[in-house]
From Swiss-Prot:
Gene: vegt-a
Protein name: T-box protein VegT-A
PROSITE patterns: TBOX_1, TBOX_2, TBOX_3
Region (Disordered): 21-40, 229-262, 295-346
UniProt main location, coarse: nucleus
Start-end of Basic and acidic residues biased regions: 229-241
Keyword Metal-binding: no
Keywords: Activator, Developmental protein, DNA-binding, Nucleus, Transcription, Transcription regulation
BP GO terms, sorted: cell fate specification; mesoderm formation; positive regulation of DNA-templated transcription; positive regulation of transcription by RNA polymerase II; regulation of DNA-templated transcription; regulation of transcription by RNA polymerase II
Length: 455
């Protein structure tokens, strides 16, 4: 047939009526074509055809009014454009193209569960044609399997540079499928064979679905919308309802538990920590151990200054310190040393207060004074306690300093040579800076080796 067409000087896609009739008569009268089967007639240009795949699905959407989403970045169609071709020459190369044309010159709107015209259509955007990525390909390739345009995308961006089909929202369109015979997309001339369109593929372009029935059809049939299936939604609703039904009872149980004594017991360790950190008021039971200067300041057990002063552990310099082993084991974890506090003991303006064990005040009414010992090796720091096994110890008497009471007497003027420095950074008018003499002394044991604690 192609040889016959070449002899006539015309291409197969542009046969004139007379030439085509002559060629047909030549084909019939040629003895070489007697063995041509009826299948060869499918290769003739006027016998090329196409059919729509998934026609039942398209028909369901068409009955409700198909809607296609368009976005700025481009959105694929569902149902997809899928056709099947037949009647092509198996060895000739063809190209497949798709374009979209408006159905009318109106703009539409969704009103009362139906589409209705809402004015004149907007100017049509530049017409774009989508070329199937397999083009060009032999006819046998196109006829082998259904042809799917799954990578086709619709957009409403008039400045799109990705090759997507540009459409206007709320307008009606239909796709057209072009079959073009060509060996090369750019160089060889195109020979138009056929154009196909199907009424089931007509749709309205939207940016959001207007018809709920279309939404349900998309959810039920689109494989990429499995998370939106109505069945899964019903299960989720049931789960939510169960949770909501159980929530009031759970709240009541929670409220009952909070009101019960168990909730108070759960916070008991926290209260214990607060009690352990509290320090006994030195001006309460043991008022005789507080100096006048500290009493004038009016420190209370809840005062930060009183708490900070009582938590320090000092070397015995200007007062006696009283400790008990059982009390030390209980409170040593909460008291920090002067090195940890980062404050030297010489900066304390108030005398040291001895901490006594938590016991009945009546049992401490009588104290036995330990005889004064002046030997230097026996002078110890108030922190030097023997750590014994943690067991209940009997109540012991208070530990007094090995220094005698005569050490607190202020020497007369001129008896000793004054030292040029003092233990306090500033001159205190109320107490005065007492300088410790270090010369002309017969007994060094009753005085400290240093004017301030350095341990």
């Amino acid at each position: 047939m192609r040889n016959c067409c070449r002899e006539c000087g015309l291409s197969a896609g542009h046969l004139e009526p007379e030439a085509s009739s002559n060629c047909a008569s030549d084909v019939k009268s040629s003895p070489d074509m007697d063995s041509v089967s009826s299948q060869d007639s499918l290769y003739l240009p006027n016998t090329v055809g196409a059919s729509l795949e998934d026609q039942d699905l398209w028909s369901q959407f068409h009955q409700e009014g198909t809607e296609m989403i368009i976005t700025k970045s481009g959105r694929r169609m569902f149902p997809q454009c899928k056709i099947r071709l037949f009647g092509l020459h198996p060895y000739a190369k063809y190209m497949l193209l798709v374009d979209f044309v408006p159905l009318d010159n109106f703009r539409y709107k969704w009103n009362k569960n139906q589409w209705e015209a809402a004015g004149k259509a907007e100017p049509h955007p530049p017409c774009r044609t989508y070329v199937h990525p397999d083009s060009p390909a032999p006819g046998a390739h196109w006829m082998k399997d259904p042809i799917c345009f799954q990578k086709l995308k619709l957009t409403n961006n008039t400045l799109d540079q990705q090759g997507h089909i540009i459409l206007h929202s709320m307008h009606r369109y239909k796709p057209r499928f072009h079959v073009v015979q060509s060996d090369d997309m750019y160089n060889s001339p195109w020979g138009l064979v056929q154009v196909f369109s199907f009424p089931e593929t007509e749709f309205t372009s939207v940016t959001a679905y207007q018809n709920e029935k279309i939404t349900k059809l998309k959810i039920n049939h689109n494989p990429f919308a499995k998370g939106f299936r109505e069945q899964e939604r019903s299960h989720k609703r049931d789960d939510v309802l169960k949770i909501l039904q159980q929530s009031p009872s759970k709240r009541q149980k929670r409220k009952k538990w909070e009101d019960s004594p168990e909730a108070d017991i759960s916070d008991f360790p926290k209260a214990i920590c607060v009690k352990e950190e509290s320090i006994m008021d030195p001006a309460g039971v043991y008022q005789n151990w507080v100096s006048d200067h500290e009493a004038n300041q009016g420190l209370t057990p809840h005062s930060p200054e009183s708490e900070g002063a009582n938590q320090e552990q000092q070397v015995p310099t200007s007062s006696s310190n009283f400790y008990n082993k059982s009390h030390y084991r209980r409170s040593s974890q909460h008291l920090s040393s002067p090195f940890e506090l980062g404050e030297p003991s010489s900066r304390r303006l108030t005398p040291d207060i001895a901490t006594v064990p938590d016991s009945d005040p009546d049992s401490l009414a009588v104290f036995h004074v330990i005889p004064t010992q002046n030997s230097a090796p026996e002078r110890t720091c108030s922190m030097n306690f023997s750590m014994e096994a943690p067991m209940k110890q009997p109540l012991r008497g208070a530990m007094y300093s090995p220094y005698g009471a005569d050490q607190w007497l202020v020497p007369a003027q001129g008896q000793y040579r004054p030292v040029g420095y003092t233990a306090y950074p500033t001159d205190l008018s109320t107490q005065g800076a007492v300088a410790h003499p270090h010369s002309a002394m017969s007994d060094w044991s009753q005085y400290s080796l240093f004017p301030y604690s350095c341990w």
